[in-house]
């Protein structure tokens, strides 16, 4: 409960900062780990990729807010990062945004598809691999993420 309260208060300010910097909040977590409490904020750039500089500027501004508001009584580590090159795909906007990119989709019945996202229309993602095109209803997706290309 305490952790959820912290996350919600941080989320409001984080969203304000992100919007000002042309970014979005991908995820926020606050939890105890083996090394202590960690406040993890994952930022995203809706029109490209997140740079180290984006993380640095966002982190500085969020730190100022956290110091000023003194929301967290004990010591903690603030981590600001991007979703990564193998980022999860979490909904229609992601499938549309990453059309043409290599992705891995695991369905609820255990099938795995690795291929290029061809399209996303009416809740159906079309992915093509060496065997052809596959249409997958996103309601049937258990897990999906981009694959790193070399």
Swiss-Prot record:
Signal peptide positions (record): none
Location of the protein in the cell: Cytoplasm
Membrane spanning residue stretches: none
SUPFAM superfamilies the record matches: YhbC-like, C-terminal domain (SSF74942), YhbC-like, N-terminal domain (SSF75420)
Cross-referenced Pfam families: DUF150_C, RimP_N
Keyword Cytoplasm included in the entry's annotation: yes
A biological-process GO annotation: ribosomal small subunit assembly
Function text: Required for maturation of 30S ribosomal subunits.
Family: Belongs to the RimP family.
Protein's UniProt name: Ribosome maturation factor RimP
Species of provenance: Thermotoga neapolitana (strain ATCC 49049 / DSM 4359 / NBRC 107923 / NS-E)
